[in-house]
């Protein structure tokens, strides 16, 4: 199975800061059809994960443009340009290029104390 490694595990930020989360896969996520099926999700407390970004850099419907995804091959990044309170939670990367689909361990975005 493809191993997805996220860093950092915890990301303390102040509101208005930029946040950056990295995701690395154990093998290339470029599909034979040329697409790269790397997705980002946000799970808020008590809720199921919600899709933010699909195929590396495409924002899902309704996702604010302060969220952006980039990367290729095995290395990917999610950036939040100005963190808002509603952005707090656990972020996951996932790949659906290979079977079975696999997820990173999560990055908790929290307020810096």
Curated annotation (Swiss-Prot):
Gene3D superfamilies for the chain: Immunoglobulins
SUPFAM superfamilies reported in the protein's UniProt record: Immunoglobulin (SSF48726)
InterPro entries, A to Z: Ig-like_dom, Ig-like_dom_sf, Ig-like_fold, Ig_sub, Ig_V-set, IgV_Light_Chain
Keyword Disulfide bond tagged: yes
Disulfide bonds: 23-93
Region (Framework-2): 40-54
UniProt-recorded Gene Ontology molecular function terms: antigen binding
GO CC annotations on file: immunoglobulin complex
Region (Complementarity-determining-2): 55-61
One Pfam assignment: V-set
Residue span of region Framework-4: 103-112
Location of the region described as Framework-1 in the Swiss-Prot/TrEMBL record: 1-23
The UniProt record lists the keyword Disulfide bond: yes
Further details from the record: This chain was isolated from an IgG2a hybridoma protein that binds digoxin.
Protein name: Ig kappa chain V-II region 26-10
Lineage: Eukaryota, Metazoa, Chordata, Craniata, Vertebrata
